[in-house]
């Protein structure tokens, strides 16, 4: 990890730059795959599965027999953990249900909103180096609460044509309707355009590598919406001299093991803590099963010493981290000053991994500085709010003249006339 001591504000932009994600260079490859999936459907998806995932498939859909077999293969202790996590995720997201209120803006004019679920959603669960069954819970649970009628899940199979049993178990528990053996760009294309097997959806959710990110960006231009721009995972720990260096190092490494392009940052007012964390990171790194991945990620990571907490907060809001852990003496007070972050973890006993799995909050969060404009996945991500209005004779007589004046000044005479004919019809 690179150490930076008392950086000038002019250095912040370069210092806080994320690892580059060059999706532009992938555009031709991604477009070719998407075009073939759009025109050839299942056949193209199956061919790309053989080329990219090295698996020969006869069909894409996961069968009931495979679901039953998977449930038997999940250890009891893992089932219990998944059930606990799903219960907490359900509780947190169910509390977000929208209750629209009718508002009378003036006598005779009543306006309100109604929350309606997106009917068809697609969830992408990456393969890669670890089975992300937790992401299944994070995406499918709020979709189920929202009332989405069709919840479609795509995830790449292994070379034997099987999906990790924990992914299938979590999907069934969280209410997924249909599961398909497809990964990468071809999976995004299948959900965006529809194939003989895979239904076309209206919105696609889920993380992925740079190819998946590029594919989601491309299909979002015309065909579907997506959850948010995605990039490599990241964490910032904001700490003072009271923080436990063992805890801080563990938190930094828990993010670093996600992938070689992940980023972990310590921002602290204590030089002593920075030195202790640097030592602890190296000590704990040697004990990790994924130490090679974490070690490469640490090359993108930084230990930053700042002069005071005001500077630390300003720097944090500029960085806008996906995950922010605050380990300071007055963490509640400092948390109130945070305006740009995906998810915030307060105090020494709130590790970021709690949010990744079982506290109940969602771990699908904005990265790459997008926390300045985006929030994480929530129940709102799976619904639309339709507005309604009802106007009586009293109401149109009150607001009608203002509408006529405004429409006339915008030179929209038909707009004006739509009100005028009603005012005259007494």
Describe these PLM feature segments.
Residues 1-119:
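N-terminal Rossmann-like NAD(P)+-binding subdomain of aldehyde/semialdehyde dehydrogenases
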Residues 98-105, 225, 262-267, 287-297, ...:
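Flexible, glycine/charged-enriched surface loops at secondary-structure junctions
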Residues 103-169:
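Conserved small-residue-rich beta-alpha loop and adjacent elements
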Residues 175-263:
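Conserved NAD(P)+-binding/catalytic subdomain of aldehyde/semialdehyde dehydrogenases
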Residues 258, 266-341:
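A glycine- and small/hydrophobic-rich beta-loop-beta segment
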Residues 318-426:
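C-terminal core of ALDH-fold dehydrogenases
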